Design a protein with these regions (language model features):
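Conserved tyrosine-mediated DNA breakage-rejoining catalytic core shared by Y-recombinases
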Residues: 299-339
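Active-site/catalytic core of tyrosine-dependent DNA strand-transfer enzymes
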Residues: 332-403
Length: 459
């Protein structure tokens, strides 16, 4: 909007001929006009730091505040009443801008150390991968895009190992056994041995590559099947450790812990630290009632999460793990009303409650991320799980087990709802995530039902 259009507005008419306004830099006049209109729209008698902070969040952040301060100094000098709240909001935004978190984007560049590039694989392997991808795209085999990518990465790791050890890049018993020994003895970048589930996934992917390519003898694939049985037995021990962690969690303390963190936010003098604590509280409160996998970091208002009928709801959302399946239903998830104030707190930050509707609307229009660092960068993919690990000693995957604990205490029929909520499509998955408390609840319910039957027949 140019100067003439701005000064033609009714609220500028008394001062339209002012030399100060006529000579003020256009950017400053535009900022001043925007602030005046914001003040009128939201019935602000006197600007507060919260008013200025919200205006800045809706209009470009620190740059908008800097320009507005310059405009105030030009128009009214250092005596301008709005300078104090503008500077207070500037200090808050500056503190958040200085925050440096571990962001999801851009990905760090790294040199491959234990993997080949896919173009360095043998030509026959590359041809097999191409055919597998084409068959997947034609619907002839069921293989999620993420799993195809993982299979390719595991194949590159296997190829690197063979090359480094002077072995032919091929599939045979000797090579696979040598690779197994390597995988079960090497350590990750964090200095720990690979988890059984990781090794199982590696050899499962290699088995799938051989199976889908239809170029390798069935006897070799059966050898891998036998190995995978052993690996899954080892994985069961790790699963039992997960349930040990679950047994140590009193589910009735999860939400109180989230409320405690949110309640203590005001004790942090730095606005960036307050933002971080709100993130942590939300990361604890919401997943038990909507147990997504590693998807929380990617949720956005408007695109995925909308405010509808008094509730934050997922709209046309398909869970990552099963969204590739034809006819897969959208996930009917939402944020339970008992915890939606954690999402409200993420939107409001330190600002007045009267701006909640405005911020909800803008968040949907601009597709703000649900989780974001104080400086506006995206959180890491495993952010929510890291918060759970810090607070409860286990990742957010435990939430799916918590769901089964709860629904089992209701009835066996309720477990179907639990399966839908957890996006599980098989009884095998349900069993894997069912802890001892849930099983005990099911046995108790069955015992009561049998007892009722005996009572009815006076046995």
């Amino acid at each position: 909007m140019n100067r003439h259009e701005i000064l033609a507005k009714p609220h500028w008419q008394p001062n339209a001929a002012s030399p100060i306004l006529l000579n003020m830099p256009l950017a400053e006049l535009q900022a001043l006009d925007s602030l005046v209109e914001f003040k009128s729209e939201h019935n602000c008698t006197e600007l507060t730091p919260s008013d200025c902070h919200v205006w800045a969040r809706l209009n470009g952040g620190l740059n908008a505040i800097d320009t507005a301060i310059a405009a105030m100094l030009t128009a009214d000098g250092t005596a301008a009443a709005a300078l104090a709240p503008l500077r207070a909001s500037h200090a808050s935004l500056s503190a958040c801008a200085r925050f440096e978190g571990i962001s999801r984007k851009p990905r760090r560049d790294y040199e491959r150390k234990i993997s080949l590039y896919s173009e360095d694989l043998p030509a026959t392997w590359q041809q097999h991968l191409t055919r597998i991808r084409d068959r997947r795209d034609d619907g002839k085999i069921k293989l999620a895009p993420d799993l195809y990518d993982r299979m390719t990465r595991k194949l590159c790791q296997y190829g690197w190992f063979l090359r480094e050890n002077g072995m032919d890049l091929d599939f045979n018993i000797t090579a696979l056994r040598a690779f197994y020994t390597y995988e079960t003895t090497r350590t990750s970048n964090r200095g720990a041995k690979l988890r059984p589930a990781t090794i199982t996934a590696t050899f499962n992917d290699l088995r799938d590559f051989m199976r889908f390519s239809k170029a390798y003898p069935k006897t070799l694939i059966k050898e891998l099947d036998s190995l995978l049985i052993k690996l899954r037995d080892r994985d069961k021990l790790e699963t039992s450790q997960k349930f040990a962690a679950l047994a140590n969690i009193d589910v009735t303390t999860i939400h109180p812990r989230a409320h405690e963190i949110l309640k203590r936010v005001s004790k942090y003098p730095n606005p960036a630290h307050r933002h971080i604590q709100r993130n942590r509280a939300m990361a604890i409160a919401i997943p038990p009632l909507t147990p997504l996998r590693r998807e929380w970091h990617d949720l956005r208002f408007g695109r995925d999460l909308i405010w509808s009928e008094g509730r934050y709801r997922l709209r046309d959302y398909k869970l990552r793990k099963t969204r590739h399946r034809v006819g897969r239903e959208t996930y009917p998830g939402s944020v339970h009303p008992s915890v939606q104030h954690f999402v409200d707190a993420r939107l409001l930050q330190d600002d007045d409650d009267k701006y909640l509707e405005t911020l909800r609307k803008r968040a949907e229009e601009q597709e703000w991320p649900l989780f974001v660092h104080p400086d506006g960068t995206l959180v890491a993919e495993n952010y929510v799980s890291q918060v759970w690990s810090t607070e409860f000693g286990t990742g957010a995957h435990i939430c799916r087990s918590i769901v089964y604990d709860i629904v089992f205490s209701i009835s066996e029929d309720a477990t179907l709802a639990g399966m839908l909520l957890n996006d599980h499509t098989s009884q095998q998955a349900r069993k894997k995530y069912t802890g001892d408390r849930a099983k005990q609840a099911a046995l108790a319910a069955a015992g009561k039902e049998i007892g009722d039957i005996f009572d009815d027949f006076d046995v």
